[in-house]
């Protein structure tokens, strides 16, 4: 019995070391303010919180953490309010939610879509080459849109 336990342990260590790999990442800070958090990943509210919330007032600069393209933009009176999703070459995507407004280029794009659809609420999926962003590029400003209880940036990294 002990032989099988030792064998199983060795096999688990061997296979887990093959599967585990590290990817060094050095992201640009998503917000131009001290990293004071008002909400953390996994805390339970009415459901589990899926990101981190950076405290701050409305209108604080929000930046792309890495090069990529905007793969989704939404404006809604509920949920994330004004939100940007960026897909990065490393396979991650980053989410920036409850924005008070978008950067001028994104704002222009989304306003034209709102007028075209005659709706405040829009959900757009720009093509990969349509809205490229660079690491550290301004994408919006912190806010209190959607289902939010105070100005902040809700931020997520997804894989």
Where are these regions (language model features)?
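Bacterial Sec-dependent N-terminal signal peptides
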Residues: 1-25
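Surface-exposed, glycine-biased beta-strand/turn segments
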Residues: 20-93, 100-102, 120, 129, ...
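Residue-level signal for short segments within beta-strands and strand-turn junctions
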Residues: 88, 157-159
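Histidine- and aromatic-enriched segments that form or immediately flank copper-ligand environments
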Residues: 92, 96-101, 105-114
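Surface-exposed acidic, glycine/proline-enriched linker/cap segments
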Residues: 106-129
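Histidine-centered catalytic micro-motifs
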Residues: 150-157
């Amino acid at each position: 019995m002990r032989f099988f336990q030792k064998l199983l342990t060795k096999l688990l260590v061997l296979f887990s070391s093959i599967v585990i790999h590290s990817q060094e990442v050095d992201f640009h800070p998503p917000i131009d303010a001290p990293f004071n958090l008002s909400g953390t990943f996994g805390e339970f509210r009415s459901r589990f919180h899926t990101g981190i919330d950076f405290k701050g007032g409305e209108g604080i600069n929000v930046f792309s953490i890495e090069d990529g393209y905007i793969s989704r933009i939404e404006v809604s009176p509920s949920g994330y309010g004004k939100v940007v999703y960026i897909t990065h070459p490393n396979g991650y995507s980053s989410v920036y939610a409850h924005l008070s407004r978008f950067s001028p280029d994104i704002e222009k794009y989304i306003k034209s879509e709102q007028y075209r659809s005659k709706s405040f609420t829009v959900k757009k999926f720009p093509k990969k080459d349509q809205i490229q962003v660079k690491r550290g590029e301004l994408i919006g400003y912190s806010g209190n849109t959607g289902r939010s209880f105070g100005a902040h940036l809700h931020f997520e990294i997804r894989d």
